[in-house]
Amino acid sequence: LKRDGNANVVMNNLFKLTQLQSMFSINMVALVRGVPRQINLRDALVAYLEHQVEVITRRTENRLKKARHREHILEGRIKALDVIDEIIKLIRASDDVAIARDGLMSAPFEFSEIQANDILDMQLRQLTRLSRIDLQTELDELRLKIIDLQGILDDPDRLNSVIKDEITVIRDKFATDRVCELTYDDG
């Protein structure tokens, strides 16, 4: 180093001869829609976002299916509370489970097979302890959840909002300040 030396030359020599600056190439090959492709960073991010849309859509559809199933069971339990004495008489008078199920599915009860199986699977003490208020509260909360889940599936902006929220959580959990600078080199 000399006093009258060019600072740019010195810096370039430091970058070249030391590990002050490192350059390396990346061969990014990824499956995009099931096809292997060489992609750049932008394409990788777009593919990730498309994947997130698919994941959140499937997850929401699954949660919606489970919520609708639970709603159907709760409707059956609330309906069963109105005729609990007749249901107990029918179950006691039946010779086996199949006859009791058929009786619950026919007039005057007309429960679905899922609801009838749920009622038959419950123990007698559970049938008597069912609280209409608790069941109705759970059903109301479940219906709000169903509306919310259906809203996510129906509205692309809402779906994007969910993706944004989840990515923000990931960013907050794993964020560290970048130590080095990423640059693009044509050479």
Positions of predicted regions on the chain:
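C-terminal interaction appendages of subunits in large macromolecular complexes
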Residues: L1-G187
